[in-house]
């Protein structure tokens, strides 16, 4: 059963915010940093690893509420999603562009 959310449950929002606050750099991704489960997640992990950034990876495939909730939370339809010091930076294309432009 797929969960479709137009508004975000406060408990899920609190869980997401807690994850974002848990470390300076947090990546909501499919899979883990060691074993990404999609090319876009792997690309962001590759960029972060290449520049030596320590980050926390949150595997959205393990929790459907987080997987669907993060899209509502950020108002961004795709995963991965990168947060730096609590601020949403974007997804794969934006992270790649930031890396390529310095």
Predicted regions: what they are:
Residues 16-54:
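Local sequence-structure signature of Cys/Sec-based thiol-disulfide redox active-site neighborhoods
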Residues 28-30, 58-63, 85:
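Structured beta-strand/turn binding interfaces of compact recognition modules in eukaryotic regulators
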Residues 47, 72, 98-101:
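Rhodanese-like catalytic fold shared by cysteine-dependent sulfurtransferases
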Residues 12-14, 67:
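Eukaryotic intrinsically disordered and solvent-exposed regulatory patches
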Residues 49-68, 77:
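Thiol-based oxidoreductase modules, predominantly thioredoxin-like and allied folds used
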Residues 6-10:
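Short gly/ser/thr-rich secondary-structure transition/capping motifs
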Residues 1-5:
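Short, Lys/Arg-enriched N-terminal segments with co-localized hydrophobic residues
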Residues 84-102:
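Non-catalytic, surface beta->alpha helical segment in thiol-disulfide oxidoreductase systems
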């Amino acid at each position: 059963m797929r969960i479709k959310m137009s508004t975000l449950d406060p408990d899920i929002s609190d869980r997401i915010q807690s994850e974002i606050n848990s470390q300076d750099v947090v990546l909501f991704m499919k899979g883990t940093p060691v074993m990404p489960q999609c090319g876009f997640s792997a690309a962001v992990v590759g960029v972060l690893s290449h520049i030596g950034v320590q980050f926390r990876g949150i595997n959205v495939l393990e929790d459907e509420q987080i997987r669907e909730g993060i899209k509502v939370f950020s108002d961004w339809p795709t995963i991965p999603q990168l947060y730096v010091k609590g601020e949403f930076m974007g997804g794969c294309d934006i992270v790649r562009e930031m890396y390529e432009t310095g």
